[in-house]
Amino acid sequence: AEFLRGKTPWHLKVDVALPCATQNELTEEDAKVLIANGVVCVAEGANMPSTIEAAKAFEKAGVLYAPGKASNAGGVATSGLEMQQNASRDSWSFDYTENKLAEIMANIHDTCAQTAEEYGHAGDYVMGANITGFIKVADAVIAQGLI
């Protein structure tokens, strides 16, 4: 690794970038530097660490971009597994929990990819995650009789 005094880590030449800190930390300017340096994949590990403009720059450049609402879901999923374990007064092994989490994350990936393809945006994980999220909320609203 290399430290660049006075610059963000987004100025390093990397294949994969993982913004995992604060909202809007990775800007359009940062995205353009990453793209120029040959980044192949950006996977968010926080809630919206990339600005909308940065996400659009990645899309335009053909960079594989995984939005936090999908790629960062592991923490929320693990909390849900912990609540389930506690409610059942059970004790799960690390391997059992890890396997359940892997299943959840694989399902999120597959659902986002399939939904994007179904709606004519194959490979667009942002579109797949957004449409999937909208459908889940809409189905819940309808199931509750609110519409």
Predicted features by range, described:
Residues 1-30:
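A structured beta-alpha segment of the ubiquitous adenosine-cofactor-binding alpha/beta core
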Residues 35-147:
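Adenosine-phosphate binding glycine-rich loop
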